[in-house]
């Protein structure tokens, strides 16, 4: 009998990974508050983030050199302006990788929708490069690198349910939110996050969401407590500019959602349902009405 501790596995050149596939999950904001505008132009936020089951798929392949991005989406750049490219370049430069990478993005998360589609693709790229080139980075390492790409990237590396503070980079993992069904709808408009924050006057926010109360409700596994505290101060800007968002929120409630909210800077709206069948019927109805 051999003790497991005495077994050593020697890595050979043939064992290196040449291809890797990873899913990049979208997020919604169960609650979003803007505390104040910072001197550097950013905003201090306090929000509860939640991963949802909508995801992009990224395929990685080793190459002799360079970074090549391809995608089935005709709406995204494939050059240095793409966050996937920026994340891959960051990893190559940081860890002195001498080879290149080809990355194919299968896009499912709506673009410019307030669901962190670009950020989660960047986070998946950090993870994918780590695995493909066997870099040995910890989750903490990747989260710290992610700050250099975007404020939501560290959260997207971590995923799950979390409290985000600072500019979104200070994260506190929370217990998983209670089981429920989430229906997501995006009107046929794109919203610039930059536009929303530029038009938000943080000093004029009269009612702030009860984020601390929501965190307590999550700890107590109280779905009703979470639903009662669902608020997003960015709605004051985005809904004013695009009234269709409020119409979708109201329609979701008419179709059985216990509550509905705009995610992030919008325009995506999500509704929370207790019963799967009701969520499915609401989906069918919204599809029929669009």
Residue locations for each model-derived region?
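Glycine/serine-rich anion-binding loops at beta->alpha junctions
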Residues: 104-133, 151, 257-273
